[in-house]
Curated annotation (Swiss-Prot):
This is Phosphopantetheine adenylyltransferase. One of its GO terms (biological process) is coenzyme A biosynthetic process. It catalyses: (R)-4'-phosphopantetheine + ATP + H(+) = 3'-dephospho-CoA + diphosphate. InterPro entries: Cyt_trans-like, PPAT, Rossmann-like_a/b/a_fold. Its EC number is 2.7.7.3. The lineage of its organism: Bacteria, Bacillati, Actinomycetota, Actinomycetes, Kitasatosporales. Its cofactor is Mg(2+). Gene3D superfamilies: HUPs. PANTHER family: PHOSPHOPANTETHEINE ADENYLYLTRANSFERASE. Signal peptide: none annotated. The gene is coaD. Reversibly transfers an adenylyl group from ATP to 4'-phosphopantetheine, yielding dephospho-CoA (dPCoA) and pyrophosphate.
Amino acid sequence: MRRAVCPGSFDPITNGHLDIIARASKLYDVVHVAVMINQSKKGLFEVDERIELIRQVTAEFGNVEVESFHGLLVDFCKQRDIPAIVKGLRAVSDFDYELQMAQMNIGLSGVETLFVPTNPTYSFLSSSLVKEVAAWGGDVSHLVPPAVLEALNGRLKQD
């Protein structure tokens, strides 16, 4: 069985993330979406909320499993016998950083990294940008799935 992981904080998941996960789900039998837990960073959504949103928006793929992780991604991969990490690249700056991580990961554990170029429609997109635009009342409906838009608008009204 071919397995891969798509890691990230997904705070919140965007259409760019979803595009990479969808494309990975066509290449692998099982795609694990690993939601990073970063104790030093307070997210807009709790980890459990992010997991639930990702499960909702990836349900149609049928081969995506979503869970959280804390620590080294290669340890997550080793514990689950996952030989590949799938990463989307938006720009050259992403490549510079991700190449270093990929080289470290293969050196630590033999886990390969597959770089997938982002759909040009989403080349500028990040969760941080979505949160900032939405917080100022901008329309982000074309940048996130409907379930995420609803959760995002609800959360921003609370704050």
